[in-house]
C-alpha cells in the first residue's frame, strides 16, 4: 500500500471530492491533515480515511511536517504528501523537502505562487506578459501609472483567482485599490497594465515533463468584470474540440510556460488574453 497524505485545511465541497477520490484509489492508504475536525466529513468519506491529524494552521510547514510524521508512525512510510488549493503549495513543498518525499520543489511552487516572479520568468523567456511592477508605496504606484497609463489592474502578488483584485481608472481609484489589495498581500501590491480582449484558461495534466491532457476554456465575461458587477451570471465555455487553429497559440504558450517555470508532474491552470 502507498501511504498518501492529503492536506485539506478546511473540508470544502471541493476538498471532500478530492479526499474521497484519492482515498478510493487502488493501493492507497490515506492519511488526512486538516484544521477542521474529522466529524465535519460525511460518514462515507470518514470510513475511507486511515489516519487523521488535526492541526492549528494547515498552511504552516512545521504543522504539516509534525502531522505527517504522526501519520507515518501509524500507517508506515509515506509515499506522497499533496493538496490542491493554491495557497498551500509553498508550505507543502517545504514539508515535502523536509520529509524526503518526491514532488514539486519549494522553488517551483514559489514561481507559480508569486505572480511577480512568474511574470518576470515568462517575460525573460520571451513569452507575452502584461507590463507589471511590484510596488510598496503609493508614490511608486503612481509612477508606474504615469509610465503605463490607465486603466490598471491592482492585486496582491500571491493572490488566488480574482480575490482582492481591482481595476483603477485614475489616481483616486488607484489609491483606493491599493488599500484593498494590501489586505491580501502583506503590504506589497502587484500592478499590471489593463489588457482588453478575450480571456481563456489553459488547464492540463503533466507527467514526467510530458503533457498527457490539456483543455482550453473561455470566460464570458472576464472574471474582473464579474468581480466589479456581482449581479452578472458569468459563463465558462468549454469547447468540445480544442484542436482548432484558434487555440494553437494558447496551447503553445501554455506548454512553453511549464518548461520555464519548472513543473515536471502535476496539474496546472493558467489564464491567457487574446487582445482585441
Language-model-derived ranges and their functions:
Residues 97-165, 171:
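A conserved helix-loop-beta module that forms one wall/lid of the active-site cleft
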Amino acid at each position: 500500500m502507498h501511504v498518501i497524505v492529503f492536506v485539506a485545511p478546511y473540508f470544502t465541497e471541493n476538498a471532500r471530492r478530492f479526499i474521497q477520490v484519492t482515498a478510493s484509489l487502488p493501493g492507497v492508504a490515506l492519511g488526512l491533515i486538516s484544521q477542521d475536525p474529522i466529524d465535519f466529513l460525511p460518514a462515507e468519506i470518514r470510513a475511507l480515511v486511515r489516519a487523521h491529524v488535526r492541526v492549528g494552521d494547515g498552511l504552516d510547514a512545521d504543522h504539516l511536517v509534525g502531522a505527517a510524521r504522526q501519520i507515518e508512525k501509524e500507517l508506515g512510510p509515506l509515499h506522497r504528501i499533496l493538496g490542491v488549493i493554491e495557497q498551500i503549495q509553498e508550505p507543502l513543498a517545504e514539508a515535502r523537502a523536509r520529509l524526503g518525499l518526491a514532488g514539486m520543489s519549494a522553488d517551483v511552487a514559489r514561481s507559480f505562487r508569486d505572480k511577480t516572479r512568474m511574470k518576470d520568468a515568462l517575460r525573460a523567456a520571451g513569452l507575452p506578459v502584461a507590463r507589471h511592477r511590484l510596488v510598496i508605496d503609493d508614490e511608486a504606484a503612481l509612477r508606474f501609472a504615469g509610465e503605463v497609463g490607465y486603466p490598471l489592474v491592482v492585486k496582491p502578488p500571491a493572490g488566488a483567482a480574482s480575490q482582492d483584485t481591482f481595476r483603477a481608472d485614475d489616481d483616486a481609484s488607484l489609491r483606493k485599490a491599493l488599500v484593498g489589495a494590501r489586505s491580501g498581500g502583506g503590504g506589497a501590491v502587484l500592478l499590471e497594465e489593463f489588457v482588453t480582449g478575450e480571456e481563456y484558461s489553459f488547464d492540463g495534466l503533466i507527467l514526467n515533463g510530458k503533457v498527457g491532457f490539456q483543455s482550453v476554456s473561455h470566460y464570458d465575461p472576464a472574471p474582473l468584470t464579474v468581480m466589479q458587477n456581482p449581479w452578472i451570471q458569468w459563463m465558462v465555455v468549454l469547447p468540445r474540440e480544442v484542436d482548432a487553429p484558434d487555440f494553437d497559440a494558447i496551447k503553445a504558450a501554455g506548454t512553453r510556460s511549464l518548461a520555464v517555470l519548472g513543473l515536471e508532474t502535476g496539474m496546472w491552470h493558467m489564464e491567457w488574453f487574446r487582445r482585441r
